[in-house]
Each structure stands twice: as structure tokens, then as C-alpha cells.
Amino acid sequence: MNIFRFLGDISHLSAIIILLLKIWKSRSCAGISGKSQLLFAIVFTTRYLDLFTNFISFYNTSMKVVYVASSYATVWMIYSKFKATYDGNHDTFRVEFLIVPTAILSFLVNHDFTPLEILWTFSIYLESVAILPQLFMVSKTGEAETITSHYLFALGIYRTLYLFNWIWRYQFEEFFDLIAIVAGLVQTVLYCDFFYLYITKVLKGKKLSLPA
Amino acid sequence: HAVHIPHDEL
């Protein structure tokens, strides 16, 4: 464990909690892409199948449980509890264009041709593009609530910090996982224009609005 | 193929 990975996990956890609280407190999931949340639930499910078979540490296991439980809770709030506030008309990204290519790629490029490893690889590839429906929805509605932009910032920063974690691990542990690194780079690049808008607008107290 | 180390990252 190193500071970058720890801060990355904290950032990821806070993004998940910000979203849960936003929906629960405001009793509304307006502006939130249910499709991205569905993809995140798939990402965590396919990545943490070794939850019971492969104990790394108490921290690792408890974080996995929290991630899986909170992602299902978020999907449940969007599609069940507060579905009346779900903005389906603007959440129209074709997720099959994300799921199918990443599934095929996970069969072609992986570390081990075993079910668990292919599912892990699929989860890594899917996570790198899972935010696209949400970013697409923000660009379609032309704006995002400030709390939603904080959620997106924390979520984007988490994988950016992981990039530094991989530099650290390459340097000091001679460990590197090219699949995770390349996917992490793609994931971070997808946030770049959002990061720009967040830093130039939201941090100056303005509302996040995209040029429609 | 070398036994792949278990993934220790979240």
C-alpha cells in the first residue's frame, strides 16, 4: 500500500458516499445516469468475485464489500426507490456499445485465460468507460448540480491517483500491470474536459454548465 | 505461463 493508492481509494469511497447521500437526502436522482451506476455495479461484481476465495487484507475485503453494497444500493435507489425522479429521457447512452467491445477485448487481451481472470479484465476495461453515460447525460442536459460535479471530480481523481500508485509500484516494487495501467489512462483521459470545467467553473463558485 | 499473482488492488 502507498499514499497514492490509499488517497485514491479514499477519493473513490467518498465519491460513492457523496452520490449515495445526494440521492438519499434529496430523495432525487435527477441528473444522475442510472446506466453508469449499473455499469459500476457490473464492474464491482465481476471484479470482486474472489471476495471469499482470496483474502488479501481486512482493508481490502471490507472496501470490496462496501463498494459492492453501495453500488447496488445506488442502482436500487435510481431504478426503484426514487425511479419517479430518474431522468430516463436524458440517460440514453447505448451501453451495449461499451459492454460488448470490452467483453470481446477481455477475451483477447488478458493475463490468464481463466474465468476469474477474464472477468477481472472485463471489469477493468468496463470501468474505464463506465462514466461515459454520465458524462454524455451532463453534456445533453448542458449542466450538472454542484454536488454531482463533486461526485464526478472525486471519481475521476481516484483513478488519476492510481496512475501515480502504479508509477510508485513500478519504481519500488518492480510491479506493473499493463492492462490496469492502459485502462486507467483511458479512464483518466475521458475526465480531462470535465476536470477543466470543474477547476475553471465549479471551484470559482459557478455552476457546471457545458456548452450545449 | 507464470502463475498470475492475485490482484491486490481494489
Swiss-Prot record, chain A:
The gene is kdelr1-b. It comes from Xenopus laevis. The chain crosses the membrane at residues 5-24, 33-52, 59-79, 93-110, 117-135, 150-168, 179-199. Keywords: Cytoplasmic vesicle, Endoplasmic reticulum, ER-Golgi transport, Golgi apparatus, Membrane, Protein transport, Receptor, Transmembrane, Transmembrane helix, Transport. It is a multi-pass membrane protein. Belongs to the ERD2 family. The keyword Cell cycle does not apply. Receptor for the C-terminal sequence motif K-D-E-L that is present on endoplasmic reticulum resident proteins and that mediates their recycling from the Golgi back to the endoplasmic reticulum. Residues 47-48, 159-169 are annotated as: Interaction with the K-D-E-L motif on target proteins. GO terms for cellular component: cis-Golgi network; COPI-coated vesicle membrane; endoplasmic reticulum; endoplasmic reticulum membrane; endoplasmic reticulum-Golgi intermediate compartment membrane; Golgi membrane. Residues 25-32, 80-92, 136-149, 200-212 are cytoplasmic. PROSITE patterns: ER_LUMEN_RECEPTOR_1, ER_LUMEN_RECEPTOR_2. This is ER lumen protein-retaining receptor 1-B. Residues 1-4, 53-58, 111-116, 169-178 are lumenal. The record marks 193 as: Important for recycling of cargo proteins with the sequence motif K-D-E-L from the Golgi to the endoplasmic reticulum. One of its GO terms (biological process) is protein retention in ER lumen. Residues 204-207 are annotated as: Important for recycling of cargo proteins with the sequence motif K-D-E-L from the Golgi to the endoplasmic reticulum. The record marks 5, 117 as: Interaction with the K-D-E-L motif on target proteins. It comes from the Eukaryota. GO terms for molecular function: ER retention sequence binding; KDEL sequence binding. Its main location: Golgi. It is found in: Golgi apparatus membrane; Cytoplasmic vesicle, COPI-coated vesicle membrane; Endoplasmic reticulum membrane; Endoplasmic reticulum-Golgi intermediate compartment membrane.
